[in-house]
Design a protein with these regions (language model features):
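Residue-level detector of well-ordered alpha-helical segments, enriched
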Residues: 9, 13, 27, 74-78, ...
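Hydrophobic alpha-helical connector segments
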Residues: 1-22
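Short, structured loop/turn "capping" segments at alpha-beta junctions
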Residues: 24-31, 55
Length: 123
């Protein structure tokens, strides 16, 4: 497969997200905009929860995951944290710069690394 470690899978996923943000202005606005539209924010949070669930399943499909906390959606939170980095880049530069794209990936991976050991056995 295209990856042998969870770190590589995490980078692959974030790169796909970045490709969507960069190719689709509407997606970028919806996900990254600093708007006060609470219902849009709610929808976005719901979207993050669903994506978090999908991401957990994707990681679980490829690796033997440790038991994850029941009270925190680690994968959804990792995405929200990296989204904040991308939003900051859009705020400052009106685009997600390569440097900030890299920082977002690092934030995503670093947060997951608090819950996933450095090495996970593949399925």
């Amino acid at each position: 497969s295209a990856f042998s470690t969870w770190h590589e899978l995490s980078r692959l996923i974030e790169q796909r997200m970045l490709d969507i943000y960069n190719d689709d202005a509407a997606a970028r606005q919806l996900i990254l905009a600093q708007h006060g539209l609470s219902e849009v924010v709610q929808a976005d949070r719901q979207h993050d929860m669903e994506l978090g669930d999908l991401m957990y399943k994707l990681f679980d499909q490829h690796f033997h995951l440790p038991v994850m906390p029941g009270d925190v959606d680690v994968f959804a939170l990792a995405m929200e944290l990296s989204d904040r980095v991308y939003a900051r880049s859009v705020q400052l530069h009106e685009a997600i710069t390569p440097r900030m794209a890299e920082e977002g990936k690092r934030v995503f991976e670093a947060y997951l690394g608090l819950y996933l050991p450095p090495f996970l056995a593949k399925r």
